[in-house]
Amino acid sequence: MAKYKKKRARELQHDRFRDTTIGFFDRLGNLLEGRGRTILYGLGGLILAGLLVMFFVKWSNRKSDEAEQALGRAITISKGSVLAAPVAGSTEPSFSSEQERAQTAIAEFEKVAAKYGDPYKSESLYFIAANRLVLDRQKGIGELTALTNSRVAEVAALSKFALAQANESDNKLDEAAQLYAALAKQNSPTVTAETANLRLAKVYAKQGKKKEAADLLFNIVDASRKAKGSDNQPLPVSAAAREAGEELQKLDPDRYAQLPPETPSLAG
């Protein structure tokens, strides 16, 4: 009986909304007879359009949340540990080999790419290509190369950086240097000039270009130590700048000694 009353209450509430809405349009129609009917239809269309926009925004937000969660699950898999045997009681994903992890991750990213639009689709394609390097290196490099032209700026930058790292790993140092230099010039929020120049300096060092490498490393650290915020206070030294300092100290101690001192409170 209680269920019936609740159901009936919902029906009555719905009927009141319907009657009120229809009654409003009826009264408005009486006031706008003749040519006013066109205005009425126009108003009805505007209200309908507004409702559709509201519905789309809510649906889009739900889809975005859903897509982010799906992408997050796939990323968690791709970061899973490679262990000889699973840890008892652990809920974190683990795999017996890098190949198994890559295959599982690719399958999960493919689901995201098939179900959602950009940026989630392009981001998934990037992760697929990056994981593919473990299974089929040449195919993965081909996919990353294609993604360097992605319309999603973050994906284009990440793909170019991953491609540069692959070339560096394969000892294709000239190709890697070109990509790192291009990324440094772009200075995107995803791959900053500081990060790209740090990698470029390491490539120069491998190529025996000690001066070029030292110049880049010096400039990274020098700029970081001199950087100030809007309050004119020194900014914390970035991880890339700290690593650049360590590399410079090993590569050219004399040049390292020429750097301005680091702010004591930020030396950490």
Predicted features along the sequence, with ranges:
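Acidic, polar-rich low-complexity tracts and alpha-helical solenoid repeat scaffolds
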Residues: 1-268
